[in-house]
């Protein structure tokens, strides 16, 4: 089985080594194509106005000056053009990708691009807390990742579906189990705009994350609830985002 690994944290990110270790537990035909620079939060962006630069950094290891989407395309359509990958793994992201994170995540986008190309694809992320922020518990993803992937692959991932896996911020032996979940929703916005000023007094801005207290417990069955209870969250996500339930109502209203 030929496996293509990517991420959004960049070619030198520690989580990329973890996803490579997970891949090597499944196969010895593992290829890494990852962004030259950190691409966190770029979602499914595609480089159309700038050329892509490709650099070989080691055997079967390539850096692309582009997004995770660019990397998967370069890997599947150029580097591995002679024999396409059988599986795409994107991660392991430093930090969870749940709830609204899904629409911002470059990690998930890398896996989505693999799905668009017709390849079974998985996004993997490791949650951290304030205490483990500088040293995420990578061993949790490394210990549990291979078996989850084996079972999910055996089950047969449907076309147009990507599997989003999030590992809780606890030691491997503290994991409560595995839950198949749905995408959750936070009870309030979590992004803020910080205004600052340069040496000439001109304003500039950073988008940051609010540290907000949890008002309500996450809804049962969601990715948020699973991680809060130290379960590994496995969420099937579909490429088709059509709201079927609202379609009939909208059709009536529009005549």
From Swiss-Prot:
Q: Which cystines does this chain contain?
A: none
Q: Does the keyword Protein biosynthesis apply?
A: no
GO MF annotation list:
3'-nucleotidase activity; 5'-nucleotidase activity; exopolyphosphatase activity; metal ion binding; nucleotide binding
Cofactor: record remark = Binds 1 divalent metal cation per subunit.
Question: Among the entry's GO cellular component annotations, what is one?
Answer: cytoplasm
Q: Which reaction does it catalyse?
A: a ribonucleoside 5'-phosphate + H2O = a ribonucleoside + phosphate
Q: Which cofactor does it need?
A: a divalent metal cation
| Keyword entries, A-Z | Cytoplasm, Hydrolase, Metal-binding, Nucleotide-binding
- Subcellular compartments: Cytoplasm
Residues involved in a divalent metal cation binding: 8-9, 40, 93
Q: Is the keyword Metal-binding in the record?
A: yes
Q: Which segment of the chain is annotated as a signal peptide?
A: none
EC number annotated for this UniProt entry:
3.1.3.5
The family classification in the record reads:
Belongs to the SurE nucleotidase family.
Instruction: State its role.
Output: Nucleotidase that shows phosphatase activity on nucleoside 5'-monophosphates.
What is the protein's given name? 5'-nucleotidase SurE
Origin species, per record, is: Rhodopseudomonas palustris (strain HaA2)
Q: Cite the source lineage.
A: Bacteria, Pseudomonadati, Pseudomonadota, Alphaproteobacteria, Hyphomicrobiales
């Amino acid at each position: 089985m030929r496996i293509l690994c990517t991420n959004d944290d960049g070619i030198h990110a520690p989580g990329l080594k973890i996803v490579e270790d997970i891949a090597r537990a499944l196969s010895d035909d593992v290829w890494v194509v990852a962004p030259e620079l950190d691409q966190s939060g770029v979602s499914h962006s595609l480089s159309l106005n700038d050329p892509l630069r490709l650099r070989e950094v080691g055997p079967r290891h390539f850096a692309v000056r582009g997004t995770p989407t660019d990397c998967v395309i370069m890997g599947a359509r150029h580097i591995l053009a002679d024999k396409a990958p059988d599986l795409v793994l994107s991660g392991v992201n430093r930090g969870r990708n749940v709830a609204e994170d899904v629409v911002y995540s470059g990690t998930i986008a890398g896996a989505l691009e693999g799905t668009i190309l017709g390849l079974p694809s998985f996004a993997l992320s490791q949650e951290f807390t304030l205490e483990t922020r500088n040293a995420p518990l990578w061993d949790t993803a490394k210990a549990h990742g291979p078996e989850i992937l084996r079972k999910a692959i055996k089950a047969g991932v449907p076309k147009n579906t990507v599997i989003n896996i999030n590992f809780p911020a606890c030691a491997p032996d503290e994991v409560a189990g595995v839950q198949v979940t749905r995408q959750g929703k936070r009870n309030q916005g979590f992004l803020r705009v910080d205004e600052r000023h340069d040496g000439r007094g001109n304003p500039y801005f950073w988008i940051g994350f609010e540290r907000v207290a949890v008002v309500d417990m996450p809804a049962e069955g969601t990715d948020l609830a699973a991680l809060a209870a130290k379960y590994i969250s496995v969420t099937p996500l579909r490429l088709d985002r059509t709201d079927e339930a609202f379609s009939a109502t909208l059709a009536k209203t529009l005549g």
